[in-house]
């Protein structure tokens, strides 16, 4: 079957790889000159299935009000003037109760665990290199309340069979030796030994090269104008004067998926702006061994070979990609506070990206009401964590095979009742 994939981020390229391996003739289209040059370029570097959790959580509405008055708040909201943003935020608020949180986190962990397993198989089969490490993740708590709240997430981990260690502050250095210098600032941590790390951009670009060698065609520097449809079928992708045709089409445009599907399929995917710093390592014994997640500031600090990646924060501000100095100051503050000798912060590269988020935190994966239009988008801050699993799942569904995990609740159909986002018309040209 001929398949066109829209988007060459980690999700689009992983989709291309798995569909190619299933025997399909695959073409990838992207406006950028190469793979992984937007949201997949400089994310936090964590592959953390156990920490897969929605931003929509109990207590978040009250915290959001408090964060409005804090300099280093992990979440910020600025109205963009669209009804779509308001409806999206309302649906997110409706997911902030305990029952929705547990349901959403449960399916996110399910997909993320499966994705890590798929990555392991891919790594074993191809020996793909991406500065990957398998040292686990350590979530750090600064208050006793955070330490006590960890029991809620532990229940989900136990249900999913995810190994963990709940550590007091005196034991944090057993996992991350450099934290011995700052343990007095912390109340403890939750360690997930099976989590991994790696450079998402390096992985995506190397996988794209492997996919191209295997027969996948990449059309870079090719802005997409619109999808062409007739009845319940998509019959082409209009790119300037050219129409690219296939038997099936996969939407993996990330945050731009919603606008590109305008008038065809409504999906509740909204950009969640995040930031990162990439820092050269200064002192080896002062740098992280693997990756940590600061629960207070929602910031991850991840070790690559000779670099430290510091990433996090969430801004609900539309498609704004301005690099804001206060956000850089927050990232610098956290990494200096936890790893004061770790990196040359003054030499850091500052970056921002738009993570495609659904109100419940779970991606939309599967077929739409159009027989040949498929979705693999809306992974939020977990695109790197979920890419291989959601792409293997998509390949299985499109190929008529039975997937290895339950998948019905990943479909966009879960939004068919009670939430139909208005189409963001002024964003229509965002990808073209």
From Swiss-Prot:
User: Which BP terms from GO are recorded?
Assistant: D-alanine catabolic process
- Signal peptide extent: none
The protein's job, in short, is: Oxidative deamination of D-amino acids.
Q: Tell me yes or no: is NADP among this UniProt entry's keywords.
A: no
Q: Which NCBIfam families match?
A: PRK00711.1
Which EC class is this protein assigned?
A: oxidoreductase
Q: Name one GO molecular function term.
A: D-amino-acid dehydrogenase activity
| InterPro entries per the UniProt record, alphabetical | DadA, FAD-dep_OxRdtase, FAD/NAD-bd_sf
| Catalysis: reaction(s) | a D-alpha-amino acid + A + H2O = a 2-oxocarboxylate + AH2 + NH4(+)
Q: Which UniProt keywords apply?
A: FAD, Flavoprotein, Oxidoreductase
Residues bound to FAD are: 3-17
Q: Is the keyword Flavoprotein assigned to this protein?
A: yes
Metabolic or biological pathway: Amino-acid degradation; D-alanine degradation; NH(3) and pyruvate from D-alanine: step 1/1
Instruction: Give the Enzyme Commission number.
Output: 1.4.99.-
Q: What is this protein called?
A: D-amino acid dehydrogenase
Q: Which cofactor does it need?
A: FAD
Q: Which family does the UniProt entry place this protein in? A: Belongs to the DadA oxidoreductase family.
GO cellular component terms, alphabetically, are: cytoplasm; plasma membrane
The species is: Escherichia coli O127:H6 (strain E2348/69 / EPEC)
Pfam families in the record? DAO
């Amino acid at each position: 079957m001929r398949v066109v994939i829209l988007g060459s981020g980690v999700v689009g390229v992983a989709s291309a790889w798995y569909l190619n391996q299933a025997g399909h003739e695959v073409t990838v289209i992207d406006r950028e000159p190469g793979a992984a040059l937007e949201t997949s370029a400089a994310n936090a570097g964590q592959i953390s299935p156990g920490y897969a959790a929605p931003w929509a959580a109990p207590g978040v509405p009250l915290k959001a009000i408090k964060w409005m008055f804090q300099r280093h708040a992990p979440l910020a909201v600025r109205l963009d003037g669209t009804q779509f943003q308001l409806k999206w935020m309302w649906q997110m608020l409706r997911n902030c109760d305990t029952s929705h949180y547990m349901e959403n986190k449960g399916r996110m962990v399910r997909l993320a665990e499966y994705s890590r397993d798929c990555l392991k198989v891919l790594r074993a089969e191809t020996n793909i290199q991406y500065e990957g490490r398998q040292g686990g993740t350590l979530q750090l708590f600064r208050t006793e309340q955070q330490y006590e709240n960890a029991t809620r997430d532990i229940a989900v981990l136990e249900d999913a069979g995810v190994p963990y260690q709940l550590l007091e502050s005196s034991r944090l250095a057993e996992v991350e030796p450099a934290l011995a210098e700052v343990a007095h600032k912390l109340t403890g941590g939750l360690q997930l030994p099976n989590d991994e790390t790696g450079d998402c951009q390096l992985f995506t670009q190397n996988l794209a090269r492997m996919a191209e060698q295997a027969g996948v065609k990449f059309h870079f520097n090719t802005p997409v104008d619109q999808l062409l449809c007739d009845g319940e079928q998509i019959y082409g992708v209009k790119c300037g004067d050219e129409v690219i045709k296939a038997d099936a089409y996969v939407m993996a445009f990330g945050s731009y998926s919603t606008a590109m599907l305008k008038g065809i399929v409504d999906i509740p995917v909204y950009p969640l702006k995040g930031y990162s710093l990439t820092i050269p390592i200064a002192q080896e014994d002062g740098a992280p061994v693997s990756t940590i997640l600061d629960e207070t500031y929602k910031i991850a600090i991840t070790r690559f070979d000779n670099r430290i990646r510091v990433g996090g924060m969430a801004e609900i501000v539309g498609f704004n990609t301005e690099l804001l100095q206060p956000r850089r100051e927050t990232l610098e503050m956290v990494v200096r506070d936890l790893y004061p000798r770790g990196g040359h912060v003054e030499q850091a590269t500052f970056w921002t990206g738009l993570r495609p988020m659904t109100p419940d935190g779970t991606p939309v994966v599967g077929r739409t009401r159009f027989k040949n239009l498929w979705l693999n988008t809306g992974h939020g801050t977990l695109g790197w964590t979920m890419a291989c699993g959601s792409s293997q799942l998509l390949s299985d569904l499109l190929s008529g095979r039975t997937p290895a995990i339950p998948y019905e609740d990943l479909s966009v159909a879960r939004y068919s009742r009670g939430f139909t986002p208005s189409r963001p018309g002024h964003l229509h040209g965002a990808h073209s």
